[in-house]
């Protein structure tokens, strides 16, 4: 079927063809100019048979077709000599002069390309002289059967002068090979990948293909001849000469793109594109189809390009003096590139026996493979071998890995999968000399960080900060819940304060908690520099610290500028699904940032696929392709509909890899001696989702209380209304926080609330999420209480205990949990402490975490400081623990105007120990709070629901 092209398409095709022809003509002209310059610079005479054509030489009387003209210019001097072996007929080689007997084709069928290098080059160098007294090099003619690079000799093997001169030349900062403008001719004809021993002397004559009648202009000393022989045959120059890339490699250059960035102009290379995708500051321009990068990544990019054998890049102009680290090698000379090269082309489709290598500890690896006599023989040759009779598997120290793999690869019918590249890179020092113990991380200088923050770090938290800085601020902090990931992250971020602005991405329920934490731990920080982004209309560019939720980040991905060099991701497991909007928005920011701190108490080790995005965010170079990660660690299987990555495999190796490179994880049981018995935390939540009616009621209640009241009854009515409205305002934030806890992997915890409306909403939400729960309130009988407690204590699945503060604060044992959440506050701190002790009882083996949810702009603003003050007074009297405030992560409330102070005093006076005349009075007040119908009530002081008897009791109470 013919394809009709438009005139525009035909025109573009013709233009492209003309450009291609023009480029080809330019290359040919450049090659001819280079050829002429080389001839002039070396004064070399080329003797070509008259029957030679312009594009290839054809010798008369022979059927050999020559397809290319290969030049072999040699530099003058006593140390620059080529020698050729005698012909098979016994005649000695002579100079390439017309009419000489030596220059005629031999009758034995040996053409001009059949000469060989003699075993002793001195034979020909000393037996013949050039009649002109000058050194004459032949123009080499290659036969049609072009030899491979493996069989192609390098002129450095035959010419020690080239090697010596190249060593004396300064290194080029571009680390790429291009034709130099120097007079070293042999540098211009490095065809092979590097010097090495001559495997086939016939290949040399085929490569040069010219009449070998070459004589030296000056005599050669025996010492020089021996050097030539030693270098050419033994290949000792490998250590002296840097390895050059093949002449067929893709060449490109680095050029300035814009201020602070450069681009790479190079042809297509799949390996190079994979490398580009691992650079943090990468950016692809679809219009020009070119990649550009930040100048801060120039050195690392050029260093990585050295590993790509098929690509050469010219240095960026003006960056020649930049120090570029060579490919990493171990101290004893073991090249990590040699280990990485084993990861390529290891598959053997015709293999009859297959196995794989697995890392089993930071010092040993295991080879899983079936029985094979040769393999067992190799295993027994390893000094560090160990055979496990239970698993019937062999293991070895990492220092034997290279030797064993090289030996196994020589067995053609055996295929062994090597260790992955990230494992080789992370444990590179271990392959040189294996050590069992971990290297100790030195303490970093934190003198420029706020002393208040440093003084509150526990020893294990200080170790976490040291680990993070040793990893250059890119890590996965996976400490167990309650071990202070927040304070560690703030300390790490403060260490890199000069690189701010800082972006914090957290669940919406804890955004304001992060803001309070920055104010508390960094007192030197201006409070105005912390910005919590609540809506998409909020600005984020003018502040040093910006805090945003995951959901809002997904909606504002185009508005969030990519200029954040330091990023903290709280609960980073929220990024487990790469297809979600939040993950798509976060990944580009994380890869372009210089410091990335991911915080997660549940790193999803049982499902490695959910961990991939976090690994890619911290170390993009580890696994550029998810499929490679899935094959190794997700037990990937190809199904009829595609690949299934839901499984897991080699989890121990993955854990070792992460702990060695990017992850630090401590469990409560490991650091229990450093933890207090109780750890209280104030979680600031935003009263979002409040209806206009409720918001107006809150404002009106606060306004009424600020006026002052004539009677005690009016005070209590106003406070009761304000307290009830607070419960309604907090419902949405409380539900979000509970769901975040469940998604974070929390299996068992207690939730205390006071209002029936709050308890009902929590139970309803748990039912929707199909989360098992128990509920104990004032309507639960004693028998049911015991059975529910037993169910919670011995449940192996996740379970939430929804409890009333006043009805379930005593007589219950729920020590199987170690987390307590107070959805609401209560004015009597004794009741709160009793509720805490439902978990902190005999049988509790862990530190207990207690979270108080406090909503700004509600009654919590006054209840929370009042509770702390009461506890302090009781502690001084010896009636309660005195360290309530000391073990609570909180911020003091400062009253900005007299009205707020008036409200606080009102709470203090009404709910103080002296304010309640007896317990029955307080019980009546509690009953009023529990029975009030928030959905139907208004701002009036008598908006209570319930039966007539209860209303009469309440009225009697307020009438006092």
From Swiss-Prot:
SMART domains hit by this protein: DEXDc, HELICc
HARP domain segment(s): 246-317, 349-420
Helicase ATP-binding domain ranges (all copies): 466-621
SUPFAM superfamilies to which the protein is assigned, alphabetical: P-loop containing nucleoside triphosphate hydrolases
Motif DESH box per UniProt: ranges: 570-573
Keyword Nucleus: yes
UniProt-listed Pfam families: HARP (PF07443), Helicase_C (PF00271), SNF2-rel_dom (PF00176)
UniProt subcellular location: Nucleus
EC number(s) reported in the record: 3.6.4.-
Gene3D superfamilies given in the database record: P-loop containing nucleotide triphosphate hydrolases (3.40.50.300), Tandem AAA-ATPase domain (3.40.50.10810)
Record keywords, A-Z: Coiled coil, Hydrolase, Nucleus, Repeat
Coiled coil: 5-41
GO CC terms: nuclear replication fork; nucleus
Principal localisation: nucleus
Catalytic activity: ATP + H2O = ADP + phosphate + H(+)
GO biological process, any: replication fork processing
Disulfide bonds: none
Gene Ontology molecular function: any one: helicase activity
Compositionally biased tracts (Polar residues): 145-165
All residue ranges annotated as the Helicase C-terminal domain in the record: 737-890
Sequence motif: Nuclear localization signal, positions: 665-682
Name used for this protein in its record: SWI/SNF-related matrix-associated actin-dependent regulator of chromatin subfamily A-like protein 1
Organism of this sequence: Xenopus laevis
Gene (name only): smarcal1
């Amino acid at each position: 079927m013919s394809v009709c092209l438009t005139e525009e398409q035909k025109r573009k095709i013709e233009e492209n063809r003309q450009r291609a022809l023009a480029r080809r003509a330019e290359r040919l002209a450049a090659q001819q100019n280079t050829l002429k310059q080389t001839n002039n610079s070396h004064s070399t005479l080329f003797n070509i048979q008259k029957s030679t054509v312009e594009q290839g030489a054809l010798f008369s009387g022979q059927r050999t077709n020559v397809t290319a003209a290969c030049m072999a210019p040699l530099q003058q001097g006593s140390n620059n000599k080529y020698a050729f072996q005698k012909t098979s007929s016994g005649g000695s080689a002579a100079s390439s002069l017309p009419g000489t007997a030596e220059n005629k084709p031999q009758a034995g069928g040996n053409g001009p390309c059949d000469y060989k290098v003699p075993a002793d080059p001195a034979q020909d160098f000393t037996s013949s002289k050039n009649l002109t007294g000058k050194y004459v090099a032949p123009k080499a003619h290659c036969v049609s059967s072009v030899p491979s690079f493996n069989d192609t000799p390098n002129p450095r093997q035959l010419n020690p002068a080239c090697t010596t001169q190249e060593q004396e030349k300064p290194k080029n900062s571009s680390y790429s090979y291009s034709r130099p403008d120097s007079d070293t001719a042999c540098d211009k004809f490095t065809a092979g990948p590097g010097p090495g021993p001559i495997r086939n002397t016939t290949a040399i004559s085929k490569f040069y293909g010219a009449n070998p009648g070459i004589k030296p202009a000056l005599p050669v000393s025996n010492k020089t001849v021996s050097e030539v022989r030693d270098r050419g045959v033994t290949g000792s120059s490998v250590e002296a000469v840097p390895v050059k890339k093949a002449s067929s490699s893709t060449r490109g250059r680095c050029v300035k793109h814009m201020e602070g960035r450069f681009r790479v102009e190079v042809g297509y290379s799949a390996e190079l594109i994979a490398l580009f995708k691992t650079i943090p500051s990468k950016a692809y321009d679809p219009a020009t189809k070119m990649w550009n990068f930040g100048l801060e990544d120039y050195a690392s990019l050029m260093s990585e390009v050295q590993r790509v054998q098929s690509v050469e890049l010219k240095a960026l102009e003006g960056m020649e003096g930049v120090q570029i680290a060579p490919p990493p090698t171990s101290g004893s000379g073991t090249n990590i590139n040699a280990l990485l090269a084993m990861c390529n082309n290891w598959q053997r489709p015709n293999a009859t026996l297959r196995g794989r290598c697995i890392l089993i500890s930071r010092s040993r690896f295991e080879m899983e493979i079936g029985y094979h006599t040769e393999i067992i023989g190799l295993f027994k040759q390893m000094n560090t071998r160990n055979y496990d009779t239970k698993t019937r598997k062999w293991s070895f120290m990492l220092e034997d890995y290279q030797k064993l793999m090289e030996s196994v690869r020589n067995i053609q019918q055996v295929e062994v999968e090597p260790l992955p590249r990230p494992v080789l890179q992370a444990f590179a020092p271990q392959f040189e000399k294996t050590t069992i113990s971990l290297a100790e991380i030195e303490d970093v200088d934190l003198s420029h960080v706020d002393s208040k923050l440093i003084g509150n770090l526990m020893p294990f938290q200080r170790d976490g900060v040291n680990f993070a800085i040793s990893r250059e601020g890119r890590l996965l902090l996976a400490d167990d819940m309650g071990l202070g990931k927040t304070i560690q992250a703030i300390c790490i971020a403060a260490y890199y304060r000069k690189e701010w602005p800082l972006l914090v991405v957290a669940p919406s329920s804890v955004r304001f908690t992060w803001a309070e934490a920055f104010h508390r731990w960094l007192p030197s920080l201006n409070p105005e520099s912390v910005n919590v982004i609540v809506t998409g209309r909020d600005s984020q560019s003018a502040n040093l610290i910006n805090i945003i939720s995951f959901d809002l980040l997904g909606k504002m991905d185009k508005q969030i500028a990519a200029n954040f060099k330091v990023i903290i991701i709280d609960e980073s497991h929220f990024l487990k699904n790469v297809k979600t909007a939040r993950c798509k928005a976060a990944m580009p920011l994380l890869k372009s940032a210089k410091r990335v701190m991911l915080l997660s108490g549940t790193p999803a080790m049982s499902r490695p696929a959910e961990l991939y995005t976090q690994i890619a965010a911290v170390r993009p170079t580890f696994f550029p392709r998810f499929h490679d990660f899935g094959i190794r660690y997700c037990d990937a299987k190809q199904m009829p509909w595609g690949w299934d990555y839901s499984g897991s495999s080699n989890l121990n190796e993955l854990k070792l890899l992460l702990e060695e490179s990017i992850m630090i994880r401590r469990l409560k049981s490991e650091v229990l001696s450093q933890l207090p018995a109780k750890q209280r935390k104030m979680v600031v939540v935003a009263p979002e989702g409040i209806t206009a009616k409720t918001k107006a009621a809150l404002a009106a209640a606060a306004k009424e209380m600020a006026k002052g009241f004539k009677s005690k009854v009016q005070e209590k009515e106003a406070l009761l209304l304000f307290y009830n409205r607070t419960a309604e305002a907090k419902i949405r934030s409380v539900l979000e926080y509970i769901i975040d806890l469940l998604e974070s992997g929390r299996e068992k915890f207690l939730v205390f609330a006071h209002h029936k409306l709050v308890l009902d909403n929590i139970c309803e939400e748990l039912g929707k999420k199909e989360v098992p729960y128990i509920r104990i309130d004032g309507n639960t009988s004693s028998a049911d209480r015991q059975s529910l407690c037993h169910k919670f204590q011995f449940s192996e699945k996740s379970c939430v205990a929804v409890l009333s503060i006043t009805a379930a604060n005593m007589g219950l044992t729920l020590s199987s949990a170690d987390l307590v959440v107070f959805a609401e506050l209560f004015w009597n701190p004794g009741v709160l402490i009793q509720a805490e002790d439902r978990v902190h009882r005999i049988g509790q083996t862990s530190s207990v975490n207690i979270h108080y949810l406090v909503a700004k702009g509600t009654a919590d603003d006054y209840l929370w400081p009042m509770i702390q003050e009461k506890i302090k007074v009781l502690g001084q009297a010896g009636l309660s623990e005195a360290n309530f405030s000391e073990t609570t992560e909180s911020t003091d409330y400062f009253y900005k105007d007299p009205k707020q102070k008036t409200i606080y005093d009102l709470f203090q006076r009404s709910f103080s120990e002296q304010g309640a005349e007896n317990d029955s009075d307080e019980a009546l007040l509690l009953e009023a709070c529990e029975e009030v119908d928030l959905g139907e009530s208004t701002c009036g002081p008598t908006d209570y629901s319930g039966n007539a008897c209860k209303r009469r009791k309440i009225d009697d109470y307020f009438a006092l």
